[in-house]
Amino acid sequence: IFAATGGAESGATTSTANITFDDVLELFYSLRSPYRKKAVWVLNDSTVKALRKLKDSTGNYIWNPSVQAGVPDTILNRPYYTSSYVPEIKAGAKCLAFGDFSYYWIGDRQGRSFKRLNEVFAMNGQVGFLASQRVDGRLILTEAVKTLGMKA
């Protein structure tokens, strides 16, 4: 999704280092309405921090945390998830994704295989194991997820 090719469709900010509330709104409404029904935000913790600092023209914070126990915070009334694999805010990086991730499919290409390695660790009285599995993921419908890229 955050790759340069084969990922989600991307929009760009007007800044190389900051996200504005207008950028977030543009990303939200760039996603077609059928996908917004199940859409979620995916971003890095540092991006959450930057979004929480955004203020409107009167100086009020735009972020409204949940006031009910057990109800998560939202961005524009849509839930968000943080991931350390999402790039941080920097020039040229895609730092925010919004969309219906049910169109991101994960495929197991072969079953798991386990191999017992008796000889390798025999001198230490140990037994080793080697496990492998081939897995891949792909965004099947690119219009279902949009990303926000920082200006290069």
Predicted regions and their residues:
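Structured, hydrophobic secondary-structure cores that serve as assembly/anchoring elements
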Residues: 1-152
